[in-house]
Amino acid sequence: MTLPHSPGSAGEPQASQTVQVHRLEHRQEEEQKEERQHSLQMGSSVQRRTYRSSEEEQQFSSEDYALAAALALTASSELSWEAKLRRQTTTVELEERGQRRVGFGNDLERMELAFLRTQRLLRQRRDWKALRQRTEEKVREAKELIELCSGRGPWFWIPLRSHAVWEHTTVLLTCTVQGSPPFQVTWYKNDIRIDPRLFPAGKYRITNNYGLLTLEIMRCTVEDSATYTVLVKNAYGQASSFAKVLIRNYLGKDAGFDSEIFKRSMFGPSAEFTSVLKPIFAQEKEPFSLTCLFSDDVLEAEQRIQWYRDGRLLRSSTRRQILYADRQASVKVSCAYKEDEGFYTIRVSSPFGPQEQSAYVFIRDAAAEKPGAPGSPLNVRCLNVHRDCLTLTWVPPSDTRGSTITGYSIEMCQGDSEEWMPCLKAPGGTCRCPIQGLVEGQSYQFRVRAISKAGTSLPSKASEAVVTGDYDAVHKSTEIPYDLGSKITISKNDFEDAVTIPSAPTNVHASEIREAYAVLSWEEPRPRGRAPLTYTLEKSVIGSGTWEAISTETPIKSPRFALLDLEKGKSYVFRVRALNQYGMSDPSEPSEPVALKGKPATLPPPAQVQAFRNTQTSVSLAWEPVDGGSELLGYYIYSREAGASEWQTVNNKPIQDTKFTVPGLRTGKEYDFCIRSVSEAGVGESSAATQPVRVKQALATPSAPYDFALLNCGKNEMVIGWKPPKRRGGGKILGYFMDQHDSVESDWHPVNRQPIPSRVCKVTNLHEGHFYEFRARAVNWAGIGELSAPSSLFECKEWTMPEPGPPYDVRVSEVQATSVMLQWEPPLYIGAGPVTGYHVSFQEKGSEEWKPVTPDATSDTHLRVSDLQPGKQYMFRVQAMNSAGLGQPSVPTDPVLLEDKPDAQEIEVGVDDEGQIYLAFEAPEAPDFPEFQWSKDYQGPPDPQRVEVEDEISKSKVILKEPDLQDLGIYSVVVPDADEDTSASHTLTEEELNKLKKLSHEIRNPVIKLISGWNVEILEQGEVRLWLEVEKLSPAAELHLIFNEKEIFSSPNRKINFDREKGLVEVIIQQLSEDDKGSYTAQLQDGKAKNQITLALVDDEFDKLLRKADAKRRDWKRKQGPYFQEPLTWKVTDDCQVLLSCKVTNTKKESRFQWFFQKKEAPHGQYNPPTGDGSLSIEGFSKENQGVYRAVVSDERGEDDTVLDLTGEALDAVLTELGRIGALSATPLKIQGTEEGIRLFSKVKYYNVDYMKTAWFHKDKRLESGDRVRAGTTLDEIWLHILDPKDSDKGKYTLEITAGKEVRQLSADLSGQAFDDALAEHQRLKALAVIEKNRAKVVRGLPDVATIMEDKTLCLTCVISGDPSPEISWLKNDQPISFFDRYHMEVKGTEVTVTIDKVTSEDSGRYGIFVKNKYGSETGQVTISVFKHGEEPKELKKK
């Protein structure tokens, strides 16, 4: 290949090189400029001993060097020739470097160009000496200018500016003045000179720092509002500047440059978080979301709000949405996977720096398809992707659900098919597996399932899609840029020689050896030719001396192959051959011996696992890292409550750090933790469990006290009070250290050397008329807390006003949605008279108005404030009142948010195991060893003579010693050292106290709990069992059974059993008799517990029991032989038959079964000996079948019978049931045309007139039988006949069948086509009836056969009918008869007679009379047999 090359472009830098050259030039110029400035500055500040050379004419001072530095910066444009020179030199170097890198061009041409450039550089030299002389001249001119300008009056370079600030803040007035010689400075306030010595110490601070004048006014008050002027003057003149300072009352915002208004005006609004991210516990395959609220709208939210997971920036995807709307930012995941677990951080950029919040998201394992199956693997990744193979890795699951993982199954999805097919099972059970046999250029995804004896896990999240290909092709090509943006790509294959047979591959080696496989790698042959290559492998066992080809399903296209069929314990060597379309290469050199490794060992557990308290619901863990190198994938953490045996997984994604905070724990509970290392070999052994740690807030020093107030004041003493720290640090406040400061002094002095346990301190040895301020620090077990801000200045002046001083220590407790409880201490200064009451007022946050809680004053030092609005914040204050009026108000409380806390603790009232009535309160969120302050009726602690208080770790109990009406009232409790309100109250009423006393009596005088009182049962053989059940008793329990005031014991007829384990007492009487009548009392005693249960068996109850026992005994005796297991019963079948059935048991072959009806045997009854079933079926049951039915079974062991009386009510029941089933069997109404009209009918299987009633309706109007409508029934049919139907008969017809309570209705619509069809059928049948009536017919008379003796006269007579009269003809053997001689016919009306005189044998034959008219014809036939004299007729012979 040839490259485009021309003389004009030879050696010229390309576009990308040009950009680099310009950047390098610019950076070099900046560096040179900085070096010059630095050298000049160093010269101005450090005096060095220098020596003048022969060329130097003058030595410069430090001022000269400073001026020269400024002139050098302005003269940089004149030295541009130097930059040009360096730029050209750099260009030459880059060109030469580029030419060496590309490796093209003419060496002679490069040398000529370099020579010409060097000549040009030499010609551009300048005279350095002339340049130095010109610089010195400019320095002298500048010095003269300075001398001319040095003497002048002062003037303000930056004047004063006005300030408007909040009170108690500091104001700093500054200005900059220039002038020479130095000037005098004087400050004025409203034209009055300010002398700091005349004001309190530290009030004013005045400084003059080289022309920068400052006046600092400390802790401004409203009196500091004024016009401040600064006057400066020297010998040449004077100047002044003034500024106004406005002091505003503090409204809760910062002042000056820290104010919110200033920030927004300068930088725009800065949104703050108004909610806190909390840990999320989501489940695999389910959605979850993280939401954060802001105080203001976030401008350009897409750019300013960023979400991170484990430090990686998150972006929206198909499963993940990052949203912002309505001051709410959220990240929503539609389908969670374990890979989504981790630390989520929201970061919002602002002008004051980024704001962040973080929370951990836990992804729990989804429910397995089979119980006990392990959790799914995670982090499935594809590594070493080649043309036909890759390596798959994953992370083992943390939760195996008690069953060891034995292996992993891999599934594969090819392309966009979305069909997951089993790929293979990972060999060895490690978390790494080679995948082979892939198609080049195809996209693949993989997922993994864990396998254990309990089953297979759910699939992991699918890996990222990868496309197979030759990823080494990038390293085989070189890109050469030219012109502007163009480039040429040269592939190494382009330089391959035109060889046919490739050479042998080289460097055959095992790149990876595992327990179950080894990966063989090699380098392509050189030369290889341009034809595509494939490879074949051969193996040889060390010592065998033979080579065996390794068969593969597909050709090997990549220089890498995984060997999965190697045997453990053997060493192999391998060699490779290359193939192309021309042939096969020689084998490569054998590899080094390869043998499979043993099973990889898991990493050891981390050491020194320590658990520390963190918050009320979390614990911090820390441990030493495991030296696992790249094999370490992270750590799994497990937890359990102290005393539990089963460990619970904390995280499902390995943690990379060596510390972690476990959230979501139960406050006050103790937990153990252990950690396991994770690697590709699996999850390692558990570390040693930590010491049990209680979930509590970690100990820390408390925050600062605040809101100092003056409670009383004398001539030289003050009483100061304050509020406790908002954060107690998780421990009890042990006391306070207090400092005081006299405003005329500069130093602070401690008030006390030992901690003050209370929040009221009396400070003595003060100076009357002086102003003092105070500050304090709280102390707990962790140490001394933060120092508070100084209080306001309090004047030490004795109080003499008649009104009382302020109440103090106003406390808010029992906060609910609409009410709070206020308590306070009375004022220390009562004024002119005693305190007569207190005035309580409240203020809603954001309002400036104080409203009274009640119209009248309260005399108590507590008050429940009700009827407040939920969800709002309120502040409260109290004023004492005496005869002189209202006194000073107390310090307002902090804003209190009114809401019902779902997990708020309440006072528990009950009775303990010893029968003591108690009131208990548990505060799991309280600090260690909390103090519980109980009070009764808010008047102070309960009377110790009546109650006893017991405190535990986080629980306190008040025990009533002798409960009485004096103990009624309101019991309240407060935990003062808790950061949040931890309080409750309970009103103990008389009704509740009586219940508790009753329960206490039961506990102190225990009664054996009765589960079931006396029960009476009759056993199978007629024995009577008396039993009762109580709670489980100890082995020492005793039983005394009293019968009619006399203790009884077991006897042959009366057996007594006492099972203490089951609490069962039973008495079994073998044969009950009159001697057993009376009362039975069981007296039980188990330690102190007693009980007595009595059963009375007397009067009718005993007689009834006696009869039942005798009957049971007789029944048992009856069952010793064959007996009826099921008595005789009747049943109506669907065919309306009455079926009598019974069943016998305990029969044998000789047993006899009989049926009887009315004391007569019924032979048609049936009996099936194998099953014992007897049955008697009665068809067409009616009142004739009423009577007594009896079945008897007997053999030599005895006899038993069963009787069924089907008379009276029983008979009515059977017939009613027959009617009901008959009604249900009625078929739908059918319409039929008849000769007389139209007939509607329904078929039934049974009909009984007495027990089934029918009614017909036409158009919902009841029909009655008449001339045209007739209704009737038969045994199997119910019908309605409409005679001579007309159009008015059209409509809906309904048949109502009533059988007892069963009513059934059947309907048919006789209209339209149905009516027309029925009417046509009626007319057809009617016409056929007319024809049939008038047709010629032979009605009667002719016999079938007539026998006559010869010579007798035969007379045949028959009756005919027909209208009109029919024609008559006689036939003999189907031939007409001629009536003459011996044949005569006579017709008399409808009677026709044929006479044959003197019959002969020839007259024998078949005769017939044929009648005919217009409606039809008919033939009557008779056979005539003539026998001779003396012969017997044939008919008689046959007989």
From Swiss-Prot:
Domain Fibronectin type-III: residue ranges: 376-471, 504-599, 605-698, 704-799, 806-901
Protein origin, superkingdom: Eukaryota
Ig-like C2-type domain boundaries: 154-246, 269-362, 1122-1207, 1336-1425
Stored SUPFAM superfamilies: Fibronectin type III (SSF49265), Immunoglobulin (SSF48726)
Localisation: Cytoplasm, Myofibril, Sarcomere, M line
Record flagged with keyword Coiled coil: yes
GO cellular component: M band
Ranges of biased composition (kind: Basic and acidic residues): 22-38
InterPro entries: FN3_dom, FN3_sf, Ig-like_dom, Ig-like_dom_sf, Ig-like_fold, Ig_I-set, Ig_sub, Ig_sub2
Regions of compositional bias (Polar residues) in chain numbering: 39-48
Key words of the record: Coiled coil, Cytoplasm, Immunoglobulin domain, Repeat
Tissues with expression: Mainly expressed in slow muscle, extraocular muscle and embryonic/neonatal skeletal muscle (at protein level). Expression in skeletal muscle is fiber type specific, with the highest levels in type IIA fibers (intermediate speed) and lower levels in type I fibers.
Keyword Coiled coil included in the entry's annotation: yes
A GO MF label: identical protein binding
Coiled coil: 119-149
Region (Disordered): 1-57
Assembly, per entry: Homodimer.
PANTHER family attached to this UniProt entry: TITIN
Its job: May link the intermediate filament cytoskeleton to the M-disk of the myofibrils in striated muscle.
Name used for this protein in its record: Myomesin-3
